[in-house]
Amino acid sequence: MGDVEKGKRIFIMKCSQCHTVEKGGKHKTGPNLHGLFGRKTGQASGFTYTEANKNKGIIWGEDTLMEYLENPKKYIPGTKMIFVGIKKKEERADLIAYLKKATNE
């Protein structure tokens, strides 16, 4: 898959303004991502999601995140995530490798 350290840098630059990853981390503009892998869309406890997120009904994993992170608004029309996405597949793979580790510690 990707490079965890490169993924961490991508997370800090592009994601950390709106998301946290640590267990017990607070929700910001976006939800805390701890426990993301294997969870259905729109299920982080204590965060208010759009109906689009709640109704998407997919399980987060490497493949679903790879597609989602390329263009979030295309993958889940109606999401309130304003991030435009990451076009480079390698950067998405690095970010996913980091998220897989960081959201499970």
Swiss-Prot record:
InterPro entries given in the database record: Cyt_c-like_dom (IPR009056), Cyt_c-like_dom_sf (IPR036909), Cyt_c_1A/1B (IPR002327)
Pfam family, one: Cytochrom_C
Cellular location(s): Mitochondrion intermembrane space
Keyword Heme: yes
Entry-annotated residues carrying N-acetylglycine: 2
Positions of heme c binding: 15, 18-19, 81
Protein known as: Cytochrome c
Protein source organism: Ateles sp. (Spider monkey)
